[in-house]
Amino acid sequence: MAANGTIVNGGAENTINDPGRGFLGNLTPSVIPHYAYRGREQFLCDYNAFSEQFNNPPNCADQWFIVTGVNKRIFDSNFRDPETGPFSNWCSYDTALELLLVRMPRSTTHSIASRTFHQVLLEALEPLRMGRALTCIGGGSHFGDMGGKGPDDAWRPIQLPPGRSRAWPAVVLEVALSEIQAKLCSDVRYWLRASGGDVKSVITLSSAAMHAR
């Protein structure tokens, strides 16, 4: 399996293919900071404190943190529908393990990376006369039994095979300020397993230059 120009090693494949519950369990506190959910006000305090560190490097190199103890009721009533603000800045929700992965707002560089990749993809498809075969469906969240997740960008064929659900993309893009192998594994694990095989490719982009934000 290829990701970001490298081959996912055997240990990573074991994580992706592990039959255990959930998909965020490998993001331990030693990998990504964890905060317990203790209500809306405390979440905002934790979010603002993390955001202050994130925006004042080198205090914090991470762009993500995990919120623990987020059951489905808490998720549905607080995080699922908001369109703006801290409560909308989650990128993955693990129903089984009650874990919510929150990401700092996308930087300009981050957005440019997504748009640039989209253009490169279209240019690569044009000689094959497939430039209009794919439609970009953006970064909206996709929900399944495992939880929910939103990519940085996603594509699917304009004409789907008979019986193929429109609920899932065929190709997803994940952009990271820094590549964390455990995060990459959780991304791939969700897309390949939750979609029931409808997602065929997970592409990751990582650039140290993005740290300039």
Region annotations inferred by a language model:
Residues 1-213:
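Gly/Pro/Ser/Thr-rich low-complexity, intrinsically disordered segments predominantly at protein N-termini
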